Amino acid sequence: MNEKSIRVLEYGKMIDRLEERCLSAMAKEKARELRPIQSFGEITQLQSETSEAQSILIQRGNIPLGGIHDIKQYLRKTEIGSYLDPKELLLVKDTLRTARNLKSFFKEGDDQTKHPIVSGLIQGLQSFRAIEDRIEICIVSDTEISDHASSTLKNIRRQISSKNDAVRNKLNGIINSSTTQKYLQDAIITMRQDRYVVPVKQEHRGNVPGLIHDQSSSGATLFVEPMAVVQLNNELRELKIKEHIEIERILMEIAEMIAQYATEMRNNQIILTAIDFVFAKGKLSLEMKGVEPLLNVEGNVHIKNGRHPLLNADEVVPTNLWIGETFQTLVITGPNTGGKTVTLKTLGLLSMMAQSGLHVPADYGTRLAIFDQIFADIGDEQSIEQSLSTFSSHMTNIVNIVEEVTSNSLVLFDELGAGTDPTEGAALGMAILNHLREMNVTTVATTHYSELKQYALTNEGVENASVEFDVATLSPTYRLLIGVPGKSNAFEISKKLGLPDGLVQRAKRFLSQDTIHFEDLLQNIEKNRRESEIERQEAKRIRLEAEKFAEGYEDRKQRLEAQRDQILRDAKKEAYRLVKEAKMDSEHIIKGLREMKFELEAKEMNKKMEDAKNQLTGKMNDLSDHHQQILNKKNKKPPKNLKPGDAVRILSLNQVGHVLNEVDPKGEVQVQAGIMKVNMHISNLERVSPEKDIQQSGTGKIMKSKTGDTKSEVDVRGKNLEEAMLEIDKYLDDSYIVGLTQVTIIHGVGTGVLKAGIKQMLKKNKHVRTHREGVYGEGGMGVTIVELK
C-alpha cells in the first residue's frame, strides 16, 4: 500500500489506538506492523476473527490475558544448557499460567461452533501445571529462592542461621567487654567481604588481634575480624558456598524441565500473542461501535452512516457515500470547512482499516471494496527544502498517481486543480478525471470549480455531490448530498453579511448568462430538494407514529385478552368454591336434622325439614344463577356424534379446542385446548366450525400462537433502554400466558445501564417470582435468569 497515502490518511493514528489496546509487547509489535492487504480470503479471515473477539467481549466481558511475556530468549538459554535466574523463571511461570487460565476460561463457557477461529487458537495452547507449580514452590521473588525448594537447601540455611547466631554472640561478647570497648570506634558489628568484623581505632590496631579486611576513607578506622571468630566465619563461608551450589542445582533442574517442552512453550507464546492481538481488535471495534463490512472485489462502495474514527464520536456527522455501481467518479463541491476533506479521509481510512482486518465505525450493511492501491492527494504537503509551490506539490503527487494507478485503485483528490489559474486548473482537473475514468479507476475529487460540476453533469459514469450549506445560519451542516451539485452561495452569504444589494447585483452582471442560468438551476434544484426532504421527514414521522400506535394497540389488546383469561380462571375457581361450600352447608343441615329426630314431634320435624329443604333449594338456585352467568352457556342440547378431531368450544372456559377421543359412557370426552388437555362433559361443549370459530376465538388464537412462537429467551442487545423495556414487558406477558416457568433475558455486558434498568423493571413485574444473574454456561453477566409465578 502507498506509504504516502498511509501517512496522509492518518492510518498510523489508528494503529496507535490499536497498539494501546494490546497487553503484551509482542502483540504491540504485531499491531505496529499491521498494513492493508489485497487478498480477499485473508481479509475475510481477519475480519471474522475480529468479529469473534467482539462477540466474546460482549457476551463475557474481558478475558484473562494479563501476564504474557516474551520468553523466547529464556527458552533458548535452557536449550543450550544454561539455567534461568529467579526473575526469568517468574516471567516464564506467568506466561504458562496465562495459557492455562485461557484454556480454562473458554472451556467453561464458549461455544466452539460460534467462535471457530478463537476456539482453534485456544485449542492449540498447552498447559504445564507441574512446571508452574515447581517454579511457584521454589521462587519467592526476583532475587530469592524459597527454603522449600529442597530439603538440602532448607537444612543448609538452618545451619547458616545457627552459625550466624554463634558469630554474632561471640562478637557481642567482644564489643560489650569493658577491656575491648575503649579500642573500638563504635560498639557495632558490621560486614566486610562477606565476613563479620568490628570497627577498631587506628591507633589501637595491635590491641585487638585479628585480620584487617578494610579501613575507612579517613584511615581512622580499621575493620578487623577478631581471631576468636575467624574459624566460625570460615565455617559460615563454607555453608554459603554449599547454599549457592544447591541453588544452582535447583535452578538447573527447573531449566531442564523447561527445556523438554521449549518448542511447545514457544508455540504457546505465538498463540498468546495472536489472541492478545485479536482481542485488541475486538476492543477497538467495541469502543468505536464498529461493524464488519461486506467486502467485494468489484469496486462497489456503500458507506452507511460512516464516522471518521479519529474525530469525537459525539460531534462527528455521519457520512453516507456510495460509488462503483452506476458511476466510478464522484465530484464533491461545497464551502470550505464544510466537510469535503473529512469525507475523503473517511472513505480512504475506512477502506484501509477494512483491508487490515479492522472493523469500521459505520452501520450494518456497509459495503467496501478491496483496492490494490489507495492514492490520496490531500492537503498542502509542499517541502520547504524542495521550494515547491502548492500547485507544484499537488501536481508532483498527481504525476506519481497517474504513473502507478490501476483499474483496481482508489484515488482521492482534495481541491483538484487548485493553486493556479482557475481556467487552466479546471481544464487540468477535467483532463485528469477523464483519464482516470477511461481507465475505470474509482475516483473521488473535491473542487470549487463550476466547470467540474458541469463536467459531472455531462459525462456518463461521473456524478455530482455536495456538502450541504445552510444560508440562513451561514454554516455548513456537514451532510453529503450525492446527485446534487454544490452552489457557491457567494452572493447569498455576502448579502447576509451586509454587502449592499446594489453591489451584489452589479457583481452578478459580470457573470456570463450561462453561469447565471447554471447557478439559478442549482438554486432551484436545492430548493426542490429541501422541500422534498421536509416532506420525506414528515412522511417518516407519520409512519413511525402509526407503527408506534399499532404496536401499542396490539399490546393493549393482548393485555386485555390475557386479563380476560385470568378473570375466567378466577371465576371458575369461585364457582367450584361455592359448590363445595353449598355441599358442606347441606351436610351440616342434614346432620342437624338427624340429631333432632328423636327430640321433636313428627309434625315439627317435617316442618323443619321442609324449611331446610327450601333453604337448600334457594342456595342451590342462587349458585346455579351465579354459575350460569359465569359459564354463559349458549346451547341447551349437547352436541351429538362427536368424534376425534371435531372442533368444539368449552363453554365454561370460552376456549376452542379439538376432541381427542370418543365419548365415554359417562358422556365425557378429552379436549385439547391450547396447551391444556381437559376432560369435559358434552353438555359443557358446543360444536364449532373448524376454521371460522377458531379464528374468531381471540383467546384460542392468542394461546395457540403464543404457545408456538414464545421462546425461552429474549435478546435485547443493541436496543436502548426504552425499546428493551417494551419488548421484555410484552415477552413476560406472553411467557406467563403459555405457562413458561423460567426464561432468559440476554442483554450483554456493555456499560451496565441496560442491565440495571431491566433489574428494576423485574422487581415491579407482577409475573416475576425471582430473578438472578446468569452463571457460567448460561451466559454469565450478560444474561438474567427469570423465574415466573
UniProtKB/Swiss-Prot annotation:
It comes from the Bacteria. It is an enzyme of class 3 (hydrolase). ATP binds at G334, P335, N336, T337, G338, G339, K340, T341. One of its GO terms (molecular function) is rRNA binding. InterPro entries: DNA_mismatch_repair_MutS_C, DNA_mismatch_repair_MutS_core, DNA_mismatch_repair_MutS_sf, MSSS, MutS, MutS2, P-loop_NTPase, Smr_dom. PROSITE patterns: DNA_MISMATCH_REPAIR_2 (PS00486), SMR (PS50828). One of its GO terms (biological process) is negative regulation of DNA recombination. Its EC number is 3.1.-.-, 3.6.4.-. Residues 690-714 are annotated as: Disordered. Residues 714-789 form the Smr domain. CDD domains: ABC_MutS2. Keywords: ATP-binding, DNA-binding, Endonuclease, Hydrolase, Nuclease, Nucleotide-binding, RNA-binding, rRNA-binding. Belongs to the DNA mismatch repair MutS family. MutS2 subfamily. Homodimer. Binds to stalled ribosomes, contacting rRNA. NCBIfam families: mutS2. Endonuclease that is involved in the suppression of homologous recombination and thus may have a key role in the control of bacterial genetic diversity. This is Endonuclease MutS2. It comes from Alkaliphilus metalliredigens (strain QYMF).
